[in-house]
Regions:
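N-terminal nucleotide/polyanion-binding subdomain common to many enzyme families
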Residues: 1-80, 205-229
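Hydrophobic/aromatic beta-strand patches that form the interior of the parallel beta-sheet core
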Residues: 4-6, 34-36, 89, 112-113, ...
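S-adenosyl-L-methionine/SAH cofactor-binding core of RNA-modifying enzymes
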Residues: 63-118
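Structured adenosyl-cofactor binding patch, chiefly the S-adenosyl-L-methionine
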Residues: 122, 126-173
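Internal, active-site/partner-interface "lid" segment
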Residues: 147, 159-198
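SAM-dependent methyltransferases
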Residues: 184, 188-249, 262
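A short beta-loop-alpha structural element at the N-terminal edge
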Residues: 248-265, 272-274
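Conserved GNAT-fold acetyl-CoA-binding loop/helix
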Residues: 252, 269-287
Length: 287
């Protein structure tokens, strides 16, 4: 994969991509990265890249011309390498929210170009002419798009084959399957009176996986109810193991109980079912 970052601060971006896990992967040519200075494509002697906005207002707006010429140069480089036309992403506060699903989508492209805004923003005409999409990494405003571009680059490049030691390294993490990651622990077993959960010391991988799954679901339910509700909808009762649904289906009395019991059997959320299902009923639901 090739990733290009169009920015006023290429040294900042390049240093990040040359450090730690990404730096080692880059040195092994597991991906190709280039950071481009917008000023190199200006046509004025002062190397000016911005001007006041039409219609008035505070701040300065980046010119369309140098960004457009830089993007054309990147397209030409990709074509010379036999690559597909790069997918162009503008990092803007007005973009669509970024998430793990989008990271996986971008990781599937052969070439991605990230354009960093600065000051008050970028002339919309170059976004309309070259942009495939606009992305925002959160509901807040930064002084420039460099940090946002590095967030996107990091989350995309780590998904490339060989960048992480094991594929499981990212498949078990938060958001990969729609849930937040379970808590992690390391040595010592007891730290300042706080012990590691006993199940993690048993060596029983089935029980450990069950504990981690329960912790992940509970953490998501408490901290990100939006993600949790979506997860429940994508994990209906019919997808559960037969031992969990064979007898249960016969006990369900109505559609409302069916929906509640689907969530119950998916993660053991008994409190949600309490208003509808008695304790005796719930006891029968769980083998």
């Amino acid at each position: 994969m090739r990733i290009d970052i169009v920015t006023l601060f290429p040294e900042l971006c390049d240093s990040f991509l040359s450090a730690s896990i990404l730096g080692r992967a880059r040195a092994k040519n597991l991906f190709e990265a280039h950071c481009h200075q917008i000023r190199d494509y200006t046509k004025n002697k002062q190397k000016q890249t911005d001007d006041y906005p039409y219609g008035g207002g505070c701040g300065m707006v980046l010119y369309a011309q140098p960004i457009a010429d830089c993007l054309r140069a990147v397209q030409a480089q990709c074509a010379a390498q036999g690559r597909a036309k790069p997918h162009v992403v503008f990092l803007t506060a007005a973009g669509r929210p970024y998430n793990e699903e989008k990271a996986r989508e971008l990781a599937g492209y052969d070439a991605v170009t990230l354009v960093c805004g600065h000051y008050e923003g970028i002339d919309q005409r170059v976004i309309d002419a070259f942009g495939d999409e606009e992305i925002s990494i959160g509901d807040y405003v930064l002084t420039g798009g460099e940090l946002a571009s590095l967030v996107v680059a990091d989350s995309v490049l780590r998904l490339q084959p060989g960048v992480l030691a094991e594929e499981k390294g990212y498949q078990d993490e938060s958001y990969w399957d729609g849930l937040l990651e379970y808590p992690q622990f390391t040595r010592p077993e007891v730290w300042e009176g706080r012990a590691v959960p006993p199940v993690l010391l048993t060596g029983d991988h089935k029980k450990i996986d069950e504990w981690r799954g329960a912790q992940s679901r509970e953490r998501t339910r408490e901290r990100r109810p939006d993600l949790y509700d979506a997860w429940c909808e994508s994990h209906p009762l019919t997808e559960l193991p037969k031992w969990k649904r064979g007898e249960n289906m016969r006990l369900v009395k109505n559609d409302e109980q069916l929906a509640l019991c689907a969530a119950l059997m998916a993660e053991g959320r008994r409190t949600v079912c309490a208003p509808v299902c008695s304790e005796e009923y719930l006891a029968k639901m769980t083998p």
